[in-house]
């Protein structure tokens, strides 16, 4: 099971783009997206142990402190972005200082997260307020197995875990329904993301 890596997009203004970060060691920080499970029937085996996380309705982003250039880098899903207090991603970092603290203590690990509060599902947040929820970590070009990532990132705020156990196709639709598990959200669950416990 491979992470869905869409093509790099050229959308957005070049004025706010930053040069991709320099990496110490192997790998990069590819763009990241999820795709519909209905398109990939049979990718999971009945009974295989999986994690099912809540799919939050927000903006996909990535963060990294590079030991090579000793800089903290902010990226949207498609682009690396200059740290400009006028943009949502920089504001989200300022409002969630635990993220930058963790990145600086764990250099060269890419943190993939969702910014919530910017889309039509507000998760209980007032206008201009954002929260970050982590859903993956990458090191040396490899996504870290999820249980290892949870332990390594125990000081991070993770997307809510909906289910852990044997994969059942019949259960997936049921898990998509109901209220968000984000504390104080007060809105519906957008969906779920199913992952194997061990990357494969």
Regions from the PLM with identified roles:
Residues 1-200:
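Core nucleotide-handling region used for phosphoryl-transfer chemistry
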């Amino acid at each position: 099971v491979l992470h869905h890596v869409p093509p790099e997009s050229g959308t957005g203004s070049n004025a706010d783009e930053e040069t991709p970060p320099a990496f110490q060691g192997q790998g990069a920080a590819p763009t990241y997206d999820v795709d519909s499970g209905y398109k990939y029937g049979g990718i999971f085996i009945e009974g295989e142990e999986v994690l099912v996380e809540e799919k939050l309705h927000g903006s996909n982003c990535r963060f990294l402190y590079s030991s090579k250039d000793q800089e903290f880098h902010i990226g949207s899903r498609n682009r690396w972005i200059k740290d400009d207090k006028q943009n949502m991603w920089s504001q989200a970092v300022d409002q969630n200082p635990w993220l930058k603290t963790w990145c600086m203590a764990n250099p060269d690990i890419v943190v993939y997260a969702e910014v919530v509060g910017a889309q039509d599902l507000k998760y209980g947040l007032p206008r201009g307020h954002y929260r970050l929820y982590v859903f993956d970590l990458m090191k040396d070009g490899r996504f870290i197995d999820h249980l290892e990532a949870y332990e390594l990132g125990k000081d991070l705020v993770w997307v809510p875990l909906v289910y852990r156990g044997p994969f059942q196709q019949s259960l997936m639709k049921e898990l998509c329904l109901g209220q968000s598990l984000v504390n104080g959200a007060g809105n519906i669950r957008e969906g779920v993301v199913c992952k194997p416990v061990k990357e494969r």
